[in-house]
């Protein structure tokens, strides 16, 4: 009896020690005006969602409210059969969490997942209808860092078989919580698997199985060998552990009954043959139980501080699970065929880039940093730490890294269509970029920069936005790459200063070149140059020999603008496909971005609104930075060298730009 009590206490202690992190995901780029129709409708829907969900027999409710830009679609659900009051409290908590965490995003969702919760619930809202639609991203994952003890191979076989068994049943019901047969294992390892799978009602059974299958795959790829984990997506949720949770398993018994305990031995006797009193036995047992519980609590507190790792796919403050991101050098060699010339994709800012294939047939891009690249250990760690925190469809995703044999290697997702400059500046290839695609590229880069500057947990300054750092996927959608020069800001920080200016000549703003000052407005300037290049189809440096433009695109465009002839800038390759108003608006936005004074340049959120809302009146632009009125005044530092390559120079802040020393471009 005492043994059973002790086990129950220990199980309770261990259970409450492992709290899962709730998954709040705010929309990436689209925002609404506070106190507008959408905001009013959102608050109305979320204020009534808890009662509406809990009153449904299946604990599921969706609704749409409003018209036009103020229309909102919302959905809430709990575990089927959960107590109405518990469900209502959970939905209310999730709704309040979204209002606080996502104050003006038009598309957000929230899965709860704390052990203190008595159920699992989900809330999502959007300005676009998502009912009955499949969505596999974004992903949120959590795993327990307590490793499995025992025969992992045998346990994994059982785990896989049980998950396959779950798959065969969950597609039709959209919800399943089940317990595996008992497994004979080591004392410190679980002998039961408690698994829960749930999909949003409305998606097909095939989509449900696909989503949950992806969740299981994601868990296995990051966290195999650990005891317990959660992976969730916008339309499905998966969790497994070695104990009950969420009230989902009730008093359900395992498939195989436990082996009965042996009968207790007769009471012990003292040396004189007398029975030891019951009071003495109780005192000894209680003392032992208290001692063991105190030790267990101490271990739990220590373990809890480091037990659960959250893989929010690049949103934590530190590097995301370095162990799961790190590749060994042999794997990289095999994947790239020993860095074969046939697999070389090109030369990046700090080294060569190769295509590779992992054993699971995942295509990768391998960035092998050259020993004399100038990107030392600091830049390498910088890129890994920053990129590992990011997740956005317009940013290249980091898969891992390798530091071995004096090599520094970054492994990225493979983006099939090379970089923007490969198409944009080639006389033959540029025909593949009609105006619709170019306009889409401008919009995608805008969304990516907006995420970096505002929507990610850190404010991140890329510092090297240019055509060669914009990769294109199979559908010509843009992805921002090469974060070796990126810097992150504190929440309350708006600008910084550096004694080592890095970037690409022609894309760097004047305050950065001359004084080393950088902010989000530095990226805005570079983006403005990129917009103008996309419109005209020419490199910034190609204007060095044109008329009296002073050798740069910015001066050339400013003169065309003042002469009321901005359409003279248009690339002949898009003469048959461009939209007159869109082109002029993009040129106008580009000029606003390259204004000399940083305060005059718009924020990326404003640029996004300018691009997506044609009714917004654009301000009159002021003269751009590096505007040259005649060729003799050309700045040799910035425009007398080969442009397009990332470079570095030292900036003594106490003197003016004439004292800047220039280093050889990498």
Curated annotation (Swiss-Prot):
**Stretches that traverse the bilayer:** 281-301
Modified positions (Phosphotyrosine) in chain numbering: 412, 512
Q: Which GO terms describe its molecular function?
A: ATP binding; protein serine kinase activity; protein serine/threonine kinase activity
Please provide the record's keywords in A-Z order: ATP-binding, Glycoprotein, Kinase, Membrane, Nucleotide-binding, Phosphoprotein, Receptor, Repeat, Serine/threonine-protein kinase, Signal, Transferase, Transmembrane, Transmembrane helix
- Sequence positions bearing Phosphoserine: 468
CDD domains, per database record? Gnk2-like (cd23509), STKc_IRAK (cd14066)
Q: Glycosylation: which residues? A: 52, 62, 104, 127, 151
Give the EC class as a word: transferase
As for subcellular location, the record says:
Membrane
Q: What is its EC number?
A: 2.7.11.-
Modification sites for Phosphothreonine = 504
| Signal peptide annotation | 1-23
InterPro entries, sorted: GNK2 (IPR002902), GNK2_sf (IPR038408), Kinase-like_dom_sf (IPR011009), Prot_kinase_dom (IPR000719), Protein_kinase_ATP_BS (IPR017441), Ser-Thr/Tyr_kinase_cat_dom (IPR001245), Ser/Thr_kinase_AS (IPR008271)
Instruction: Choose one Gene Ontology CC annotation of this protein and give it.
Output: membrane
Name the chemical reaction catalysed here: L-seryl-[protein] + ATP = O-phospho-L-seryl-[protein] + ADP + H(+); L-threonyl-[protein] + ATP = O-phospho-L-threonyl-[protein] + ADP + H(+)
| Cytoplasmic side stretches | 302-666
Q: Which residues form the active site?
A: 464
> Any S-S bridges, and between which cysteines?
none
The residues on the Extracellular side of the membrane are 24-280
Which residue ranges does the record assign to the Protein kinase domain?
339-616
Q: How does it sit in the membrane?
A: Single-pass membrane protein
Q: Where is the Gnk2-homologous domain?
A: 24-130, 136-245
Amino-acid positions noted as binding ATP in the UniProt annotation, renumbered to this chain? 345-353, 367
Protein family according to the UniProt entry: Belongs to the protein kinase superfamily. Ser/Thr protein kinase family. CRK subfamily.
Could you tell me what this protein is called? Putative cysteine-rich receptor-like protein kinase 31
Name its species.
Arabidopsis thaliana (Mouse-ear cress)
């Amino acid at each position: 009896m005492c043994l059973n009590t002790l086990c129950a206490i220990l199980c309770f202690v261990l259970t409450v020690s492992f709290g899962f992190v709730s998954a709040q995901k705010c929309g990436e780029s689209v925002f609404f005006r506070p106190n507008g129709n959408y905001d009013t409708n959102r608050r109305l829907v979320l204020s009534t969602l808890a009662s509406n969900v809990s009153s449904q027999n299946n604990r599921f409710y969706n609704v749409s409210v409003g018209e036009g830009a103020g229309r909102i679609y919302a959905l809430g659900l709990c575990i089927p059969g959960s107590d109405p009051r518990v469900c209502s409290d959970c939905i209310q908590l999730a709704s309040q969490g979204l209002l606080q965490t996502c104050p003006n995003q038009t598309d957000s969702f929230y899965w709860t997942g704390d052990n203190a919760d008595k159920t699992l619930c989900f809330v999502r809202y959007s300005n676009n209808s998502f009912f009955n639609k499949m969505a596999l991203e974004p992903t949120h994952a959590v795993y327990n860092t307590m490793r499995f003890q025992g025969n992992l191979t045998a346990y994994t076989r059982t785990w896989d078989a049980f998950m396959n068994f779950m798959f065969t049943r969950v597609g039709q019901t959209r919800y399943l919580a089940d317990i595996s047969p008992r497994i004979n294992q080591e004392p410190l390892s679980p002998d039961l698997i408690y698994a829960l799978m749930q999909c949003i009602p409305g998606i097909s059974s095939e989509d449900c199985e696909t989503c949950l299958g992806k969740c299981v795959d994601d868990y296995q790829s990051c966290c195999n060998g650990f005891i317990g984990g959660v992976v969730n997506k916008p339309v499905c949720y998966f969790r497994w552990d070695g104990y009950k949770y969420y009230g989902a398993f009730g008093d359900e018994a395992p498939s195989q009954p436990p082996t009965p305990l042996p009968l207790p031995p007769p009471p012990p006797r003292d040396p004189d043959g007398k029975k030891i009193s019951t009071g003495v036995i109780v005192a000894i047992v209680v003392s032992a139980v208290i001692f063991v519980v105190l030790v267990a609590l101490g271990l739990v507190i220590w373990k809890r501080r480091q037990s659960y790792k959250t893989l929010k796919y690049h949103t934590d403050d530190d590097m995301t699970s370095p162990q799961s991101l790190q590749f060994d050098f042999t794997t990289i060699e095999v994947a790239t065929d020993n860095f074969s010339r046939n697999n070389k994709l090109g030369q990046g800012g700090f080294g060569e880039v190769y295509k590779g294939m992992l054993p699971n047939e995942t295509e990768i891009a391998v960035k092998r940093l050259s020993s004399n690249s100038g990107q030392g250990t600091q830049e390498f760690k910088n890129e890994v730490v920053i990129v590992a925190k990011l997740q956005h469809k317009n940013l290249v995703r980091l898969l891992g890294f390798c530091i071995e044999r004096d090599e520094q290697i970054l492994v990225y997702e493979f983006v099939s269509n090379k970089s923007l400059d490969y198409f944009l500046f080639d006389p033959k290839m540029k025909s593949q970029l009609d105006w619709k695609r170019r306009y889409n590229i401008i919009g995608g880069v805008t969304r990516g920069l907006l995420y970096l500057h505002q929507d990610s947990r850190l404010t991140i300054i890329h510092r090297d936005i240019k055509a060669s750092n914009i990769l294109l996927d199979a559908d010509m959608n843009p992805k921002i790459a090469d974060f070796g020069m990126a810097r992150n800001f504190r929440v309350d920080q708006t600008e910084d200063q550096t004694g080592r200016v890095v970037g690409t000549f022609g894309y760097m703003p004047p305050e950065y070149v001359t004084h080393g000052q950088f902010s989000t407005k530095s990226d805005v300037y570079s983006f403005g140059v990129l917009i103008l290049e996309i419109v005209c189809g020419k490199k910034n440096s190609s204007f060095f020999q044109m008329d009296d433009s002073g050798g740069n695109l910015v001066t050339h465009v400013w003169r065309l603008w003042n002469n009321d002839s901005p359409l003279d800038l248009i690339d002949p390759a898009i003469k048959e496909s461009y939209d007159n108003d869109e082109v002029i608006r993009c040129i106008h936005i580009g000029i606003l971005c390259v204004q000399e004074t940083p305060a005059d340049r718009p924020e990326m959120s404003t640029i996004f609104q300018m691009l997506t809302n044609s009714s917004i009146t654009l301000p009159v632009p002021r003269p751009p930075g590096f505007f040259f009125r005649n060729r003799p005044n050309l700045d040799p530092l910035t425009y007398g060298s080969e442009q397009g390559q990332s470079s570095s120079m030292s900036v003594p802040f106490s003197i003016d730009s004439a004292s800047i020393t220039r280093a050889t471009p990498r």
